[in-house]
């Protein structure tokens, strides 16, 4: 997808983004995987999630691209919901390096449900272009795995445990500024899943 000669998604694949949804006074920000195939953009949401609940009432959404793993963690904890603003056309969004204002239209009524993302406008706020940061990437990947823990079989959880130990310890070693987040995640995971 190109906007103003800047390519937001250079290749096909799954991009971790922050999805902002809103209806009335209710807002939500969730990390989701945006599936990109050419110009076809899709997200998959479980029906038990707040994002799904809001999108079926208001299909307008904001897709925020951010290089900051802390934002993903804060969104996972529900700490970004109060940062949602609405554009003049009623699209909910949070600030980020790039924000895509779009409609998320239901495509398949399964669980997870498939939504087609139809872009309306892009807002580019990049004032500096950050280099690829391995620690942020590992932390975001670990957060994806954490969201899968509740739905995985016990034997798969052991494989995820080994992967999480590697990703979290490496993120902490490479970026000491993320240490408090890593320690908090480790404490929560140990308590919740006895890993």
Question: Where do the language-model regions lie?
Answer:
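Short, low-complexity, polar/charged sequence segments that are solvent-exposed and flexible
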Residues: 36-38, 61-65, 81-85, 121, ...
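Small-residue-enriched segments and motifs
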Residues: 16-17, 99-104, 115-117
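Flexible glycine-rich active-site/ligand-binding loops centered on an Asp-His dyad
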Residues: 105-157
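An accessory alpha-helical subdomain
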Residues: 146-194
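Histidine- and/or cysteine-centered catalytic micro-motif in compact active-site loops
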Residues: 32, 46-48, 66-68, 77, ...
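N-terminal structural module
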Residues: 1-60, 64, 70
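Ordered, amphipathic secondary-structure segments that act as subunit-interaction surfaces
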Residues: 58-106, 110
